[in-house]
């Protein structure tokens, strides 16, 4: 990918990077491990973004 990106694409990629995280530890503790993984997780090689 190009080093110089348009601002809109850069913001979309940054939002996708932020959303691609595990739920916080306090959420796992509060729900008694009912919530342990995020359904929105994405692997960089398997699922490509439409950004």
Swiss-Prot record:
GO MF assignments: structural constituent of ribosome
Keyword annotations of the record: Ribonucleoprotein, Ribosomal protein
Domain of life the protein comes from: Archaea
Pfam families: Ribosomal_L39
GO BP terms: translation
GO cellular component: ribonucleoprotein complex; ribosome
Family: Belongs to the eukaryotic ribosomal protein eL39 family.
Protein name: Large ribosomal subunit protein eL39
Organism of origin: Pyrobaculum neutrophilum (strain DSM 2338 / JCM 9278 / NBRC 100436 / V24Sta)
């Amino acid at each position: 990918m190009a080093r110089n990106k348009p601002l809109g694409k850069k913001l979309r990629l940054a939002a996708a990077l932020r959303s691609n995280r595990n739920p916080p530890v306090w959420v796992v503790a509060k729900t008694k491990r009912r919530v342990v993984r995020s359904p929105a997780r994405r692997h960089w090689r398997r699922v490509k973004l439409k950004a």
